[in-house]
Amino acid sequence: MEDEQSRMKKKKQERRAPVTHTDSKMSIISLGKPEPVLTTGTDYQEIWYDNDFDHYSQPIDRLALAQLVNLNGQHGGVLYARRNMVAADYVRGGLSHEELKAGVFDYLTFGDVAIAKVRNGWGDVVALAPLPSLYLRVRKDDSIVILQKGEPLVYSQEDVVYLKQYDPQQQVYGLPDYIGGIHAALLNSEATIFRRRYYHNGAHTGGIIYTNDPNLSTEVEDEIIKSLEQSKGIGNFSTLFVNIPKGDPEGIKFIPIGDISAKDEFANIKNISAQDILTAHRYPAGLAGIIPSNSAGLGDPEKARATYRKDEVIPLQRMIMDAINSDPQIPAHLHVKFDIEDTQSGAL
């Protein structure tokens, strides 16, 4: 009788025996490398003379400054608004409206701009043209170099009018006046991109796929690993069908690593960083499309515009006129003229 019960028990255990794994070691897989959101490239560097390329290095990477314009809505929007306000009063001169807007935008974005004097065969100045500041470099003899494929374009000091914003640490290149707000612009953009990727990825920031079902065969495990490794990029956690006969419903789990819904500072980051950007540009919030958070509002936008025009726009317009019109080689018909005597604006 005992032998019969022993055989019955052994047979029952054999029926319940789980699938054994040939490889019992722990498995860890990666679902893709971390993707960088933004690279700063905007740290201030000491300039030095590059003898190989025969020009001074730049204090801040200009490609990073150019990319930042399109990465952040507040920063880029304010730059375009500042450019438009300067160009709105342009009357006439050796620059077309489009050329003036390009030169002003480069001056605001990179901190300097070079206006080339276009000469005829007799050496007379017959036109003016802004040079792209993104590719502008300066040599020891103060000549201006414009990088391009092949040999660079070189303009002697007397062939350009070089306007630059003051930098107390060096006097070779100009420095944008919004430098103090760069990190706020980066933070604002990174917060938005992080939120977009969070929802693209299934409302989680990644996690651990944990399996503890003894009925999960090695073949099924390999198929799961293969499917996960083949899914890359944003939203790499897609629907996956797994069939484990007599499996445990809790045998496969996805454990999120982080959850931003518990303490979401997205709104605070966006609001504070946006205010920092406007402060760096000294630009009125009422002109930037900022929605007021209090019942008092942002004041009269016409008064804000008049004050901003008086303190920021007109001084820049006068500087451009003085730099170009005071050059003895530039004839009077090429002198630039801004209508800065607009009494209706209330700026003067």
Where are these regions (language model features)?
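Flexible, gly/proline-biased loop segments at the beginnings
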Residues: M1-Y135, I260, G297, R305, ...
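Extended, charged amphipathic alpha-helical segments
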Residues: E2-K12, E151-L298, K303, T307-L348
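Short, charged N-terminal helix-start/capping segments
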Residues: D23-D52, V138-I146, S189-Y210, F241-N243, ...
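Active-site and NAD+-binding cores of ADP-ribose-processing enzymes
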Residues: P36-T40, E46-W48, G121-G174
